[in-house]
């Protein structure tokens, strides 16, 4: 141990004096310089752009290994691995033209490679692209990604669903740390605002190898807004207006960077009235108000990179209790309502050694949730405080083998102070250790990993034994071993095959273990089961991709077997006129996939046609259908790109038809849902007025005011339709 510590100290001090730089030139195949290419080093949070001669320069770089990516609209992204730097280094890049979306570095998987190089298929979407679709919330935008849906309560509350799994079976990461906000409840939303978020990555399938418990169904990984390029200052103001809810989204941000220091801050405010259905009536008390603030400061030099970020989010949500009642455009919520405060503090560090590096991420999340029935005295008040940590050591590359080992953990406390207890006061502790390796040869890659986890949950007794709201004391420990194996190869130059097999697990949550009372979100009496076992699954994924200059096609298939799947089942009893449901377990299977294509006909360089189809089926071992499985969906988009002389650039117009099929494969406590078609229009671009420019976008969602009820809407049981026609106008000014 002493020798290891001494080696780390010597390695650290040897790079303190390093003052390395990388410079070069970016050109196209005709040897012409490319101006405005984004050059970015993700581990350093450092970026710049090429000048009019295609030249760029990075200063104060570490001796250790890192990556630099080169991205430019209309060209294929390149990622360059940098190691063993001299004082001055030259890296010249030649980019080739591409009509499809730019390739992106995937942060949520172990080795941070471009998606085209990644063993696992990960969906990557920029928040700007999702915002261009005119959605009013982040979760609405996410639900447009193939394989992702939402369980909604009006327009204000949405929970992500990945291939039929949701709640505690889907993990959410933001600012590099795990988000914990009582996600077991269907009426508990995502708790994130899209302002100040750069992009989202979606892992569809078990990811317990990297993320531990609860990553059984997948991961939503939100990448925060990038800092400004070195030695620049940027500020912007954006405003959106929504006709349906008479809503407004406002955001203002600024950021600046030197060669070493970085700073950014962004504030936003969203306010919406009750949403209007197709016949013109409003759904009472679906109004909401949201305040969000994000800030960050970063420092990097030749030895390490460190970024401290903070996010404050306040939500005031009305709960639709009486369906379509009093008609109002007020934005002041009525009873019942929810008040939620979220504080997220993260510290992300990368320490560089000569041929290796150490990542250390620390996070603290404070979630304060209050529910008010008929007065400003909270009937339910829960405070969830979570500290988590994640450390990964990247070994020096050994030939063609890359290796990572890591530890991960969490300490969490839940405290109640309201009249009602939904779950007891409790403490949860997680610890996990893992290792993974990547071997690459010719056109093939193999990636494998192993992990061990332990979760311990202890809770206190509460209430009077035999009465509603009584909780027995609990002390349970859950262990799990998990593994993953992935293979990627090029069957031919344009055809790529990916095959992944991975296991995942989820320990029962507090509600499943301890519930004893009426769950207001479901209007039923729920009884927990302290003897529940860990859910354990194994999923096989097959992905085929074909891509040439003008045509792109993909097909994703999966089969997910879950042992000890936890769900509620009626006991046949009633208490206080509520049906009694108990938590039980059974094995389950989910299977399905996504298929799609992107066609860009030559020589019509301005025209794109995209289509995708997604399906998932879930069954218990007795062949009954699982609840909350999204209906099949077929999505078609025709998109044009254009430019009008010198005053309108990066213009686009899109026509979208989203066809959701009937859902007849329902559990015993659900009803079937009818299919529907929604037509959406989009238009936008950059308006240039002399030296000034601003972005504008105009969307018409549900253009023909279709009356429909989504299968995963929690208002479906009351026969309340989803939102009607919504015209959205947005502008963004660079100040």
What are the residue ranges of the model-derived segments?
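Flexible loop and strand-edge segments within Gram-negative outer membrane beta-barrel domains
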Residues: 272-280, 284-290, 303-386, 413-414, ...
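Outer-membrane beta-barrel signature, preferentially recognizing the C-terminal barrel domain
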Residues: 327-348, 425, 471-496, 503-562, ...
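Gram-negative outer-membrane beta-barrel transporters
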Residues: 558-562, 581-663
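N-terminal periplasmic accessory domains that precede
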Residues: 89-94, 138-141, 158-161, 173, ...
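Transmembrane beta-barrel wall of Gram-negative outer-membrane proteins
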Residues: 23, 243-271, 281-316, 337-354, ...
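C-terminal beta-signal and adjacent terminal beta-strands/loops
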Residues: 273, 505-506, 561-564, 568, ...
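Short, acidic, small-residue-rich periplasmic hinge/interaction motif at the N-terminus
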Residues: 27-32, 37-42, 71-75, 85-131, ...
């Amino acid at each position: 141990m002493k020798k290891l510590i001494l080696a780390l100290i010597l390695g650290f001090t040897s790079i303190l004096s390093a003052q390395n730089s990388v410079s070069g030139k970016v050109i196209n195949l005709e040897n012409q310089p490319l101006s405005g290419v984004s050059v970015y080093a993700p581990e350093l949070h450092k970026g710049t752009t090429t000048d009019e001669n295609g030249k760029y320069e990075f200063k104060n770089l570490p001796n250790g290994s890192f990556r630099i990516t080169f991205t430019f609209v209309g060209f294929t992204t390149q990622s360059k691995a940098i190691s063993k730097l001299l004082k001055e280094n030259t890296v010249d890049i030649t980019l080739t033209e591409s009509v499809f979306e730019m390739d992106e570095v995937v942060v949520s998987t172990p080795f941070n490679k471009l998606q085209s190089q990644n063993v696992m298929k990960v969906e990557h979407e920029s928040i700007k692209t999702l915002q261009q679709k005119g959605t009013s919330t982040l979760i609405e935008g996410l639900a447009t990604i193939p394989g992702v849906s939402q369980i909604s309560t009006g327009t204000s509350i949405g929970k992500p669903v990945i291939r039929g799994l949701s709640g505690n079976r889907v993990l959410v990461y933001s600012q590099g740390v795990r988000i914990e906000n009582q996600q077991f409840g269907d009426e508990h939303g995502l708790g994130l605002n899209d302002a100040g978020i750069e992009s989202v990555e979606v892992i569809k399938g078990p990811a317990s190898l990297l993320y531990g418990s609860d990553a059984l169904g997948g991961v939503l990984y939100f990448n925060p807004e990038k800092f400004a390029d070195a030695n620049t200052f940027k500020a912007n103001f954006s405003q959106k207006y929504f006709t349906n809810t008479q809503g407004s989204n406002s955001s203002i941000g600024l950021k600046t960077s030197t060669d070493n220091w970085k700073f950014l801050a962004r504030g936003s405010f969203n306010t919406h009235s009750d949403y209007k259905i197709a016949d013109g009536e409003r759904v009472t008390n679906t109004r909401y108000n949201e305040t969000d603030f994000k800030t960050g400061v970063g420092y990097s030099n030749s030895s390490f990179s460190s970024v401290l970020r903070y996010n404050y989010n306040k939500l005031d949500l009305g709960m639709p209790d009486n369906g379509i009642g009093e008609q109002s455009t007020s934005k002041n919520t009525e009873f019942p309502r929810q008040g939620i405060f979220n504080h997220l503090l993260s510290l992300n560090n990368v320490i560089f050694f000569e041929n290796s590096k150490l990542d250390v991420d620390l996070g603290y999340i404070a979630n304060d949730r209050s529910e008010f029935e008929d007065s400003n005295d909270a009937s339910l008040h829960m405070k969830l405080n979570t500290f988590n940590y994640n450390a990964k050591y990247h070994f020096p590359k050994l030939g063609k083998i890359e290796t990572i080992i890591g530890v991960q953990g969490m300490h969490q406390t839940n405290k109640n102070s309201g009249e009602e207890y939904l779950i007891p006061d409790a403490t949860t502790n997680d610890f996990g250790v893992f290792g993974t390796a990547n071997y690459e040869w010719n056109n093939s890659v193999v990636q494998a990993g192993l992990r061990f986890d332990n979760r311990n949950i202890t809770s206190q007794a509460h209430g009077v034994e035999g009465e509603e709201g009584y909780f027995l004391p609990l002390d349970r420990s859950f262990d799990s071993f998990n593994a993953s194996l992935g293979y990627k190869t090029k069957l031919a130059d344009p055809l790529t095959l990916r095959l992944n097999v991975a296991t995942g697990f989820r320990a029962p949550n507090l509600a499943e273990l301890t519930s004893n009372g009426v769950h207001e979100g479901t209007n039923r009496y729920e009884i927990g089961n302290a003897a529940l076992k860990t859910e354990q699954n194994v999923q096989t994924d097959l992905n085929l991709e074909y891509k040439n200059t003008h045509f792109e096609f993909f097909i994703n298939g999966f089969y997910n077997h879950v042992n000890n799947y936890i769900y509620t089942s009626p006991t046949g009893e009633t208490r206080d006129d509520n049906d009694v449901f108990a938590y039980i377990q059974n094995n389950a299977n989910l299977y399905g996939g996504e298929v799609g294509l992107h066609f860009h006909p030559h020589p019509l360089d301005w025209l794109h046609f995209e289509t995708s189809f997604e399906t998932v089926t879930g069954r218990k071992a007795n062949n009954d259908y699982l609840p909350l499985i999204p209906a099949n969906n077929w999505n078609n988009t025709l998109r044009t790109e254009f430019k009008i002389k010198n005053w309108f650039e990066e213009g686009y117009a899109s026509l979208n038809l989203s066809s959701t099929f009937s859902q007849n494969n329902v559990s015993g406590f659900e009803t079937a849902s009818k299919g529907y078609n929604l037509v959406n229009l989009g238009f936008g671009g950059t308006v240039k007025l002399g030296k000034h420019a601003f972005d504008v976008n105009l969307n018409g969602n549900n253009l023909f005011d279709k009356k429909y009820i989504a299968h995963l809407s929690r208002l479906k049981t009351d026969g309340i339709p989803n939102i009607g026609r919504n015209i959205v106008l947005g502008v963004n000014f660079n100040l």
